[in-house]
Amino acid sequence: MQATATTLDHEQEYTPINSRNKVLVASLIGTAIEFFDFYIYATAAVIVFPHIFFPQGDPTAATLQSLATFAIAFVARPIGSAVFGHFGDRVGRKATLVASLLTMGISTVVIGLLPGYATIGIFAPLLLALARFGQGLGLGGEWGGAALLATENAPPRKRALYGSFPQLGAPIGFFFANGTFLLLSWLLTDEQFMSWGWRVPFIFSAVLVIIGLYVRVSLHESPVFEKVAKAKKQVKIPLGTLLTKHVRVTVLGTFIMLATYTLFYIMTVYSMTFSTAAAPVGLGLPRNEVLWMLMMAVIGFGVMVPVAGLLADAFGHRKSMVIITTLIILFALFAFNPLLGSGNPILVFAFLLLGLSLMGLTFGPMGALLPELFPTEVRYTGASFSYNVASILGASVAPYIAAWLQTNYGLGAVGLYLAAMAGLTLIALLLTHETRHQSL
């Protein structure tokens, strides 16, 4: 059963109980940490962890084991969405957001402090895997809560704009994570970086967590949740209610996120791998050159996120997403071979800039659209669950599927794969209702 839409009264009074700036900063900082952590772990999992946390007999096996710990977070995220969603819908948004940020932050700092295999043996990879699971658990509850914090405190007609602030965490986290590693590579020797320098970004994230906690603790509870709590309308088991009474909208919400996840991981992880791999497997471009291209292209991503929020508030959340998803399909069908496949650095950069700008346009409205699909009593659980299940279907496998398709069928097949995933998103969008005028 899908939640019914309630039309907003154009004359509805809006009395904010939380400072606008606090709401926006509190919703942004958690997702910024989320993506910062993702990129520093992804980088370290390839270049550092195989040498620090795993036996040195077989370098290939050590790298694969390291990447397996990276994948653990994708398994943990839906579990985190169920756990934190339960308390977010039962106890409140504020307390749950503080708990998810603490879980994520402590796990990240622990990774930066862990001794290696040479010191504690087999306990090193086990503790790394446990800390990575803790990261994923916290991440599973972070995005949904941040999106609700923004949208449930937003004034009428500005929900997509407010909801775009958690989405800004993706380009900000990406930019600072890669910038941190570039800075460390300039300041330290390879020996210094492998000895202790890699730990700096993980430990530094504690500063961001402390700032986020300070802002979140000072907030009042979401006014939308307070109404439900006062009326004692919380459900006993939000996940059970979601999967029995709101199955259709949960499935649609998951498929709506597919194009976003697939596009992001193809534009970042796969494009980096393909561009830097030696010919004939890849383009053979220098790693630092491609990293700089990605960092510059991510600026386009960041600019387009709030632009997409403004457009969605003006023309409709669902309608704008239908148009943007159609543009992603066209990009997927016509941009891969002429731009990325050219090997020309200028055209490769144009490909990255165009793709990541589209990423900003599709990711921006999600902070409002997904929460709007669910009623208040299961909104935290529903938005988080759809978002994180989609990460398994779209994010975790996209780079591997893309690499396999390119090896066996050519670069055009990667574009067809992205177009197919965006097509599923387009169908899901067409099966949902417009949510812009819906009351939360």
Question: What function would you assign to each model-found segment?
Answer:
Residues 42-43, 246-301, 394-398:
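Extracytoplasmic gate region of multi-pass secondary transporters
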Residues 45-77:
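Extracellular/periplasmic helix-loop-helix junction of adjacent transmembrane segments
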Residues 81-93, 305-317:
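Helix-to-loop junctions at the C-terminal end of transmembrane segments
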Residues 90-102, 314-326:
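Cytoplasmic membrane-interface "Motif A"-like loop-to-helix N-cap segments
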Residues 102-120, 326-342:
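C-terminal ends and interior cores of transmembrane alpha-helices
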Residues 161-185, 387-398:
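Glycine-rich segments within core transmembrane alpha-helices of 12-TM secondary carriers
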Residues 212-219, 421-440:
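Multi-pass alpha-helical transporter architecture, strongest
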Residues 318-365:
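C-terminal transmembrane helical hairpin of 12-TM major facilitator-type secondary transporters
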